[in-house]
Amino acid sequence: MPAADIVRTVTLAASPAVVFDAVTTGTGGWLWPGEVEPRVGGAAGPGGVVTAWRPGRHYANRMEGEGGWFNELDFALEAGDDTEEATRLTYRHSSVFDEGQVPGVEEHTDFYLHTLAEYVAWFRGREATFTSVDAPESSRAAGSAARVLQALDLADDVEVGDAVVVDLPGVGPVAAGLSYRTASFVGLRTASALVRVFGREAWGAGVSVSVHDFADGADAAATGSAWQRWLDDLFS
């Protein structure tokens, strides 16, 4: 299997210092929680090693495995041209991917970077309570992502940027903005949370939901239980 690079350049509405903190210590706010030892050679999550550490400018980590396998994530930061509150991020994901895996990784990359942009724009520096739940195996079937959107009352004509009221499990009806929508993924932003729906049936996997909750007193166990019941009922 050949190695490949997935590269994206995005502009984020935050300073390089804020973005650097987000990709090193604030990953629970947009990806999932992880711990990084702040030095080259330090630990970066399970099995990873920090390979670049220049606060406000450059962070990278690498993991290696058997048979020459590796996985490397690289975040290069530059200040925006017109304002200190803008950062040009060049993100590179280098790895040995399975055949046919790259398109799915590219779509996930775009969604995660969008969530990073939402985090630094709306919730920067705030601690997130992270929850992730998986739907039953039956959600591997074609059309499962659309089924979730229908259950959330997000009709086909609801577009990115639209304001909606969504009945979220464990929360009830809440005002939200639809910030991301593709055939597979949906992003919602409320006043206190980022809700992410992953429909992975196109790649042989099921639906999952991640919630980054920035409210005081947020309860990951309660949020997870509410979403799990909702998904189990939907795909029973």
Predicted regions and their residues:
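Well-ordered beta-strand positions in beta-sheet-rich domains
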Residues: 7-9, 47, 72-74, 173-175
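Short, glycine/acidic-rich beta->alpha junctions
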Residues: 4, 42, 69
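Short loop segments at secondary-structure junctions
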Residues: 16, 53, 80-81
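Hydrophobic ligand-binding cavity/cleft-lining segments
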Residues: 1-37, 103-160
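Non-catalytic interaction/regulatory modules that flank or connect domains
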Residues: 142-193
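Short, hydrophobic/aromatic-rich segments at coil-to-beta transitions
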Residues: 37-43, 52-62, 161-163, 181-187
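Beta-strand/loop substructures that line and gate deep hydrophobic ligand-binding cavities in soluble
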Residues: 58-108, 179-236
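Short, exposed beta-strand/loop patches in secreted or surface proteins that constitute
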Residues: 34-38, 48-53, 77, 155-158, ...
